[in-house]
């Protein structure tokens, strides 16, 4: 006889079995196999929290297409300002890392446990101090490969602006004179020109000296009033670092980790990734501590270099104003090709970004982490950071017009108050007016306190220099 109870049991069993199969199917397929992912795992990507000291990471944009071709538009002039690629620590940071390494090595710990358990078989990641300051050459995040690969990417993008069949023409590439910057420029140029590199590229190294004045990519060196130490690490509370030290001393006893060691561990993670492509130190810090150390870097960048520094905008305007002059010249470019590729340091890039008004945010607080801000140094000036400024010639309503498009770290970056053009670009005339208005008080000689008898150049002219 039919039993309602038995039927219910069967129904429940079938439902359970169906649920198990569904879970197994989801496990096999994985959430990332869905047509459109529903997770935001990239927020946990450690490369987004290294304060500009780790490998390149693209900017989190707005989903705007960055293709070289926009309907009814062509790129007819382009500027690149790029930071050198991934590098070894500086000499000073290297000493700081060595000190932590020696401290951990000397600790009276027979068998390490917890997050620092790997240290039992760990060797310092820089085999020779001569590597300090240099570009990295191998691993997943090789700085030289970053430069070469980006050169190949831009060649595809700007191929229509290069005619390699014309004899005697050269592509000029400018770089700060520090070795890693020049190396970046050379490897980029090799990627861009391939086998024609030696014949068709001239890499111009601009001295990073006061005597170079404003005719350089490091104008800050010639600004006597510039103070790059407005913010100091001790200006922000270290309660998070103290909690993290307590956590590590509980989980990995015997190493006597202090609050001062926490930012150094973060440095270890970033630079070892640059060199080896992996780092066990990246798994040592808690998420809270990692966000804390990243914010310390943000504060340093903001107050010592960017918007929070009274001279950041003035110094950055030297380069921004020179590119403005080239963008306005729609008759004929002064060089063989309408391409202006420049290479420098993170500091110099951020000062240019400031003069362009890319990150006009309220001052970062010095008592708590500001999460709701667009000023994230990791996304703004990672190793290999790059700013593209493209002039577009577009046909709009039957008339040819010029526009300017800004691309920061591979993401189209619409200007907050000027994005009415194709692809959210800015009309050229409006771009110029906006830049001049933002920098009406950016008088370098006056603001920087340049002596009246200064013998160094007071304008950037290398884009036009040495023209036959």
From Swiss-Prot:
Instruction: Show the InterPro entries listed in the entry.
Output: Acid_Pase_AS, His_Pase_clade-2, His_PPase_superfam, Histidine_acid_Pase_euk
Q: Which residues are glycosylated?
A: 163, 196, 256, 321, 360, 453
Give the family from UniProt: Belongs to the histidine acid phosphatase family.
- Native species: Komagataella pastoris
State the superkingdom.
Answer: Eukaryota
Query: Know the name of this protein?
Result: Acid phosphatase PHO1
Q: Which residues form a coiled coil?
A: none
Read off the PROSITE patterns from this record. Answer: HIS_ACID_PHOSPHAT_1 (PS00616), HIS_ACID_PHOSPHAT_2 (PS00778)
Induction trigger: By phosphate starvation.
* KW Hydrolase (keyword) present: yes
List the active site.
84, 346
EC number(s) per UniProt?
A: 3.1.3.2
Alphabetized GO MF terms? acid phosphatase activity
Q: Which GO terms describe its cellular component?
A: fungal-type cell wall
- Pfam annotation, one family: His_Phos_2
């Amino acid at each position: 006889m039919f039993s309602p109870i038995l039927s219910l049991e069967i129904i429940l069993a079938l439902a359970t079995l169906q649920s198990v199969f569904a879970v197994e199917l989801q496990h096999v397929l994985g959430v990332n196999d869905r047509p459109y992912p529903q997770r935001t795992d990239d927020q946990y990507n450690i490369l987004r929290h290294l304060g500009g000291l780790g490998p390149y990471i693209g900017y989190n944009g707005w989903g705007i297409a960055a293709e070289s071709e926009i309907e009814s538009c062509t790129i007819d002039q382009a500027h690149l300002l790029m930071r050198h690629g991934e590098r070894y620590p500086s000499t000073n940071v290297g000493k700081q890392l060595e000190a932590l390494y020696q401290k951990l090595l000397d600790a009276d710990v027979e068998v390490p446990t917890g997050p620092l358990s790997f240290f039992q078989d760990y060797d310092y990641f820089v085999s020779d101090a001569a590597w300090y300051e240099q570009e990295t050459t191998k691993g997943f995040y090789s700085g030289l490969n970053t430069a070469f690969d980006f050169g190949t990417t831009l060649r595809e993008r700007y191929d229509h602006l290069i005619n390699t069949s014309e004899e005697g023409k050269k592509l000029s590439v400018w770089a700060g004179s520090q070795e890693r910057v020049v190396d970046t420029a050379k490897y980029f140029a090799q990627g861009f020109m391939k086998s024609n590199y030696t014949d068709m590229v001239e890499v111009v190294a601009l001295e990073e000296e006061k005597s170079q004045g404003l005719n350089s990519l490091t104008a800050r060196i010639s600004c006597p009033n510039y103070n790059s130490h407005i913010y100091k690490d001790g200006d922000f509370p270290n309660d998070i670092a103290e909690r993290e030290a307590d956590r590590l001393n509980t989980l990995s006893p015997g190493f006597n980790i202090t609050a001062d060691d926490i930012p150094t561990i973060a440095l270890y993670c970033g630079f070892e990734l640059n060199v080896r492509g992996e780092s066990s130190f990246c798994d040592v810090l808690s998420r809270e501590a990692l966000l804390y150390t990243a914010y310390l870097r943000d504060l340093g960048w903001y107050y010592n270099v960017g918007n929070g520094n009274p001279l950041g905008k003035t110094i950055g305007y030297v380069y921004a104003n020179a590119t403005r002059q080239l963008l306005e010249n729609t008759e004929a470019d002064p060089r063989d090709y309408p391409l202006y590729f420049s290479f420098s340091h993170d500091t110099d890039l951020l000062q240019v970004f400031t003069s362009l008004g890319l990150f006009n945010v309220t001052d970062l607080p010095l008592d708590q982490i500001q999460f709701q801000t667009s000023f994230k140094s990791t996304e703004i000036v990672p190793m290999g950071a790059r700013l593209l400024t493209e002039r577009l010639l577009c046909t709009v309503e039957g008339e040819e017009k010029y526009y300017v498009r800004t691309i920061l770290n591979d993401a189209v970056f619409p200007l907050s108050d000027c994005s009415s053009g194709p692809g959210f670009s800015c009309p050229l005339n409006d771009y110029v007016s906006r830049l001049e208005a933002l920098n009406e008080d950016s008088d370098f000689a006056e603001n920087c306190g340049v002596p009246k008898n200064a013998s160094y150049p007071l304008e950037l002219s290398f884009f036009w220099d040495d023209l036959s």
